């Protein structure tokens, strides 16, 4: 059934005794990503989890021209060259693994973090006024407003 | 064009007259969005103050900058649970967040984080008095299907001339609770009464300011009509209802619009309409003409929200205890009404009016506490028939009638001591409103409002009145006792409404018997 072990999750960020300075030194030594930038504890695993799947590599993927045309239309990616086609085939083959996992009697998950409790934040204003910075990202602004094409308005106006 | 309409009306009317009389029923369901009172937003640390300068309460997360993540505000969960408990809901041990996608300029993410599959709470029930002018008050119960937490969107201003929208993201991410009620209502008055009661409850809980003018409480109504016994009709949704009064008007308008449409052989289409308060009508809106696919999906950035349902549990940093929150729920309006009926022996309707106007209730409780010898009936009559009526006449919100409890107490004290009469008390309500700094005794002196109770003065007025109203005197002496009112009225007029009417009536009876 559901097998989630505590070690899958980032222990450092969820621990209350976490000391930033200590951790920084550790990162320098281990040359790992700097997680101290997270403002709040996370429930997301911070290290990849190795998993063993059966490799269906012998199932060679064949795609007919009609499907390729459809995929090109949908993705706007040109699949004309042999290399592009090979990449597509290997991608499908890679994803195909998932279809061979036995999921009998396993309740579907909405999220892999389902057994985790959501972290809560105290009701405090900690940020907000970055207007100049954020408005700079917009193409059209007017007097501190973002400007967009007209939205839904009553028909008779 | 005009003549065409006339012809068509004439052509359809006879048909209607011959058609068997069919009974139509209207069905109304409400969705209420209530802004949860909080310092910061639902998932970010920016402020929620109303009227903050444009785009200044916006974090990177609210502006949907890549790499930002939501962190849930604890207070919003607590407020949601409290509200759910007050409305008799089942709070769910595990609830989840979902993304609801739609494309709109004031929604920078392209989706709203809401709760669809597993909401915070379900299956509540609200029972409330329905007040229809000129009809008897009755109680109505409506099922509350779901209470969910969700983000608000930004605010768009539509610039008609330049054909563009101006977007302010201050409201984007502000915490809301959406309350979805079952379509158990029938009329606009019932809907308005439900919202009125909800406002009272949320204000007591302090989970929502309910300031509709600030958009802190928004009501959408789903309205359909169907023949008795037939399945429900196609519904329309009316949005943009900005006040409690508009709720009843908008829904009544929409029901009548649908009835007229069907009577003329038309068909109601599923559409979103907007309430035009100025012209008092609903107007079709351009968007959402086709059923939208919101492409709901689980919010991958938020694990499920757990709460502790164990009785007697306490809240911890990680886990909120529902049992602990249930202890924080104050007395609810319906309980107050019952207490008023039991403790002060008020009738049910008086209790409803007092509770529905929190200011009146405060005045009542404070006045009865310090003026124990004034009968409660005198106090409630004064507050409801005189003070509230005065405010309604001026179209003034009772909350804006600023006067101290003490001033009202002084008026009632003078009234009870027969120092002034009811006419003078009414005049004082107006005088206190226009001269808020003057004391009641000053005003009585300045405006010469003392009641005349001296027997000799009253007898003089009575003699005069008897002389003036000889016809009424004759009628009275022939046995028409009601004619006495005409003579008493004359005394009131002669004394500039200042005579003590109790003594006047006694005096007149005595004089006329002779």
UniProtKB/Swiss-Prot annotation, chain A:
GO terms for biological process: glutaminyl-tRNAGln biosynthesis via transamidation; mitochondrial translation; regulation of translational fidelity. It is found in: Mitochondrion. GO terms for cellular component: glutamyl-tRNA(Gln) amidotransferase complex; mitochondrion. Its EC number is 6.3.5.-. It catalyses: L-glutamyl-tRNA(Gln) + L-glutamine + ATP + H2O = L-glutaminyl-tRNA(Gln) + L-glutamate + ADP + phosphate + H(+). Belongs to the GatC family. Keywords: ATP-binding, Ligase, Mitochondrion, Nucleotide-binding, Protein biosynthesis. InterPro entries: Asp/Glu-ADT_sf_sub_c (IPR036113), GatC (IPR003837). Subunit of the heterotrimeric GatCAB amidotransferase (AdT) complex, composed of A, B and C subunits. Its main location: mitochondrion. One of its GO terms (molecular function) is glutaminyl-tRNA synthase (glutamine-hydrolyzing) activity. This protein may be expected to contain an N-terminal transit peptide but none has been predicted. This is Glutamyl-tRNA(Gln) amidotransferase subunit C, mitochondrial. It holds the Pfam family GatC. It comes from the Eukaryota. Allows the formation of correctly charged Gln-tRNA(Gln) through the transamidation of misacylated Glu-tRNA(Gln) in the mitochondria. The reaction takes place in the presence of glutamine and ATP through an activated gamma-phospho-Glu-tRNA(Gln).
